[in-house]
């Protein structure tokens, strides 16, 4: 009986299906799905995409790793803008909307950290599921043709900005802006697991 209960609990835990991580070269998934941002606007990935591409940052308000990386978010958004790459942060913790991850919390969080970029809510974590995203933060960078050219982490040291040695995402942004190949197109994303709805 205990064995059956254990199996049932495991089945329940994995009842929300998440796709495999989006392969490099893939097109933007669910590019036209509408999401509400903290300013009340309806936005889609296609509406955010610019001439040279799109950067999607799956993030949240409550993950300690996200908070550690906050001092780099605006810089990355500005670099994206400079290189004609659209930038959007997407709150995908649909399983914690009542615990610090609803729209009101997003507005407070953005104000606290001085966000200067789009921050939208992923209803039901549908977008994150389509991407196969599993962590916050989890980065996906697309080129001007809407093809995935980088995925993974922001850099190699979330805890201390001054000790970063490898600027994975910044290097990728600059390469895309200059229409050059990315030296390291895939890194291991790490952070908190996305809280998908049950």
Please state what every model-predicted region is.
Residues 141-198:
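Thiol-/selenol-based redox modules, centered on thioredoxin-like
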Residues 50-54, 82-87, 114-118, 144-145:
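Loop/turn elements at helix/coil->beta-strand transitions in domains of secreted/extracellular proteins
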């Amino acid at each position: 009986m205990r064995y059956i209960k254990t199996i049932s609990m495991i089945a329940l835990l994995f009842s929300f299906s998440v796709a495999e991580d989006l392969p490099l070269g893939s097109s933007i998934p669910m590019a036209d799905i509408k999401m509400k941002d903290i300013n009340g606007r309806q936005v889609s990935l296609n509406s955010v995409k610019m001439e040279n591409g799109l950067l999607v940052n799956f993030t949240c308000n409550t993950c300690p790793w996200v908070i550690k990386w906050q001092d780099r978010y605006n810089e990355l958004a500005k670099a994206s803008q400079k290189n004609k790459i659209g930038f959007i942060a997407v709150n995908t913790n649909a399983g914690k909307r009542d615990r610090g991850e609803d729209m009101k919390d997003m507005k407070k969080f953005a104000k606290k950290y001085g966000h200067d970029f789009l921050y939208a809510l992923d209803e039901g974590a549908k977008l994150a599921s389509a991407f196969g995203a599993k962590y916050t933060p989890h980065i996906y960078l697309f080129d001007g043709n809407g093809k995935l050219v980088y995925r993974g982490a922001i850099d190699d040291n979330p805890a201390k900005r001054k000790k970063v040695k490898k600027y994975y995402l910044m290097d990728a942004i600059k390469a895309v802006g200059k229409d050059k190949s990315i030296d390291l197109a895939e890194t291991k994303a790490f952070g908190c697991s996305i809280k998908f709805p049950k």
